[in-house]
Amino acid sequence: MEDATEMSGGAEEFAEGSKINASKNQQDDGKMFIGGLSWDTSKKDLTEYLSRFGEVVDCTIKTDPVTGRSRGFGFVLFKDAASVEKVLELKEHKLDGKLIDPKRAKALKGKEPPKKVFVGGLSPDTSEEQIKEYFGAFGEIENIELPMDTKTNERRGFCFITYTDEEPVKKLLESRYHQIGSGKCEIKVAQPKEVYRQQQQQQKGGKSNASGGRGGGRGRGRGQGQNWNQGFNNYYDQGYGNYNSAYSDQSYSGYGGYDYSGYNYPNYGYGPGYTDYSGQQSTYGKASRGGGNHQNNYQPY
């Protein structure tokens, strides 16, 4: 219990989810997925409970981006892999009156470390030179993509940065928000095409099974009128995406006995609450480097 007390005092010293996020595509034996959480369980509650099994270096509970309400699941990163084994040895875990379901989080096999990031909330007035200067400070940039609205020929409120290696991405993800130019931007890992396709399929499956029919797909429906928005919504939460897209677990295959409609899991992340990234008020009229077909090239990027 002394260990738990020590952790509860220092639990807020690290940026929530930053260390978990930075290694999401890499195998980390100290990382766990925690399902079945009570909506009332806080990050502090979860950290204090799990600290009895070992030192917790990062912990995050995923929330609805619009309501801020817990989705009932999260991730934890232990300092030592032995702590994960201790958690798994105990057959039953109860927290805040609910049985929780801790599982080992495993990165997808054969997945390369991320070298590309999504930058949301970018002011369309931010010049390409400003973008190069800021992101170049983290490492060597291979490519910058500045998506355009093909109807208005104006810059969108987001961009993509590709580095020559993964180290700059790790550094960037240590902080969720970055001040770039006049705007506060959110940095996420850009999902590869195969993950995007998986998410599309899972979205369709989730909508057909979820209660309320089409009502659950409101965010995606808005995007159908704008291809960029449809692709953007499917970035989900870049730190985690859909659990099965960013991580795999042999015993889950869709997180087993849990009802996705309750978590609204397939629609997690960039939905209606993030349409302010559209840049509709932008006046920056720089032409797209890829011409009229550039939009198709960067979807889902």
Curated annotation (Swiss-Prot):
It comes from the Eukaryota. One of its GO terms (cellular component) is nucleoplasm. Gene3D superfamilies: 3.30.70.330. It holds the Pfam family RRM_1. Its main location: nucleus. SUPFAM superfamilies: RNA-binding domain, RBD. Residues 30-112, 115-194 form the RRM domain. It is found in: Nucleus; Cytoplasm. Residues 1-29, 194-230, 269-301 are annotated as: Disordered. GO terms for molecular function: DNA binding; RNA binding. Residues 212-224 have a biased composition (Gly residues). Keywords: Cytoplasm, DNA-binding, Methylation, Nucleus, Repeat, RNA-binding, Transcription, Transcription regulation. One of its GO terms (biological process) is regulation of gene expression. Acts as a transcriptional regulator. Binds DNA and RNA. This is Heterogeneous nuclear ribonucleoprotein D-like. The lineage of its organism: Eukaryota, Metazoa, Chordata, Craniata, Vertebrata. The gene is HNRNPDL.
